[in-house]
Design a protein with these regions (language model features):
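His/Asp/Glu-enriched, well-ordered alpha-helical/loop segment
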Residues: 1-86
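C-terminal cap of metal-dependent C-N hydrolases
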Residues: 7-23, 76-138
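Peripheral (often C-terminal) accessory segments that flank ATP-dependent C-N-forming ligase machineries
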Residues: 139-143
Length: 143
């Protein structure tokens, strides 16, 4: 169960909408920068290897390679631009999700996404979401 009435005391309010419920240990926001720092910065892993592990292979596993996961003609222009020298520290205040709890809080490193594009449209820049809600689209598995 991701929500219990006991959390009302922690949050200070009653959650009425299921989409306001948080649970687990969040990491999606920080996952890339932590992986880049641990792999590419600390262990000299080639960024191409990281792109393969975090984009190409997941797209293949989910059956959407051919539209997602690579930079090729016919694929969506989903891109993440990284400044490999930009330093960062993950704090509770820097987390954009409802729960301000993450195993990554307190970590510091180098290599920060500075721009994110979905289908060629800039959706995030310098850590700020710049797109309107609803720019994403459901992708069905390619047969």
């Amino acid at each position: 169960c991701s929500y219990d009435e006991k959390f009302n005391e922690i949050l200070g309010n009653k959650i009425e909408n299921v989409f306001d419920v948080w649970g687990g240990c969040s990491g999606i926001q920080s996952g890339f920068q932590v992986t880049f720092n641990e792999g590419c910065v600390k262990r000299n892993v080639c960024p191409t290897v990281l792109a393969n592990a975090m984009s190409v292979q997941p797209a293949k596993a989910f059956g959407i390679y051919g539209r997602k996961g690579d930079i090729k003609p016919g694929f969506d222009a989903d891109l993440l631009i990284v400044d490999p020298e930009k330093e960062w520290e993950i704090t509770s205040d820097s987390l954009l999700y409802v729960n301000k709890i993450s195993a990554f809080v307190g970590m510091k490193g180098k290599g920060l996404p500075i721009m994110t594009m979905i289908r060629g449209n800039v959706v995030a820049e310098d850590g700020k979401i710049v797109a309107e809600k609803g720019v994403g689209t459901f992708i069905k598995k390619i047969k």
